[in-house]
A protein has these predicted regions:
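Phosphate-group recognition and catalysis centered on beta-loop-alpha active-site segments
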Residues: 1-247
């Protein structure tokens, strides 16, 4: 199966956001700007308490929004009622995002995971996507979630998000062995991703480049924020996921 569509255009990280212009990440305004610029869209999904896929990076409110609380402890209606601090946009459901994009841009959906084996978000995403016909791919840092996607929803395009090192302080829910396996991509024979999204600051790196060469897995790189990053990406990767900079 050709995934040329996945690497055809640069991908705007959390939409084409620009806080100085009042365009906040992961909002309808940022996604509309990416579509207008003919870019793909990368965005993040969290699960609400009542099982809805919500478009938001952080697992708690407060950084960009009014209000407080973890998304997993709030209903979709409660989350949608929350105001952003700097825009009239509201947090979208995945269904609302799909209605907005309507096949006009490639969608790269990062499923957030707490590495607990909870498959509710994946199940909801698969259900919502079942009636959508636009170019879409899933990805996650969690290899077990990608393995689950392969076994339960094989029609969905899936990828692994990865980097060279996973610090104990940032990834405290994971034992050292799991962090090592993720850094070296040792899970790939089981998780079987169809593409890799790898940290640009860690390129070149043996594991993703080997899999790119041997198995022809498309290699995206994140997050490109400068011409220097772009030069590195151009040498090692097939396409960029970018922000705070224009390709």
């Amino acid at each position: 199966m050709s995934l040329d569509w996945l690497t055809a255009r640069p991908i705007a990280h959390r939409g084409l956001h620009d806080a100085q212009r009042g365009i906040i990440e992961n909002t309808a305004t940022a996604f509309a700007a990416a579509i207008s610029g003919s870019y793909g869209i990368e965005t993040d999904l969290q699960i609400s308490a009542d099982g809805e896929a919500m478009v938001h990076h952080d697992d708690a409110l407060g950084r960009l929004t009014e209000g407080m609380g973890r998304l997993g402890e709030l209903s979709a209606a409660q989350i949608k009622s929350v105001q952003f601090k700097a825009t009239a946009d509201r947090i979208l459901t995945l269904g609302e995002l799909l209605d907005l994009v309507a096949g006009r841009a490639t969608l790269l959906l990062e499923l957030k995971s707490h590495f607990t084996g909870d498959g509710r978000l994946l199940a909801r995403v698969a259900d919502v996507l079942s009636a959508y016909r636009g170019p879409t791919a899933l990805m996650s840092f969690d290899p077990k979630l990608i393995e689950l996607a392969r076994s339960r929803y094989p029609a969905l395009i899936r990828g692994i998000v990865a980097q060279r090192h996973y610090s104990r302080s940032e990834w405290k829910e994971l034992p050292a062995s799991a962090r090592r396996n993720m850094g070296l991509l040792l899970h790939v024979p089981r998780s079987r991703p169809q593409f890799i999204a790898y940290s640009v600051r860690d390129l070149p790196a043996g594991p993703p480049l080997l899999m790119h060469a041997l198995w022809k897995l498309p290699l995206l790189t994140w997050t490109v924020r400068s011409d220097k990053d772009r030069k590195r990406a151009a040498r090692w990767a097939d396409q960029v996921i970018f922000e705070d900079w224009r390709p």
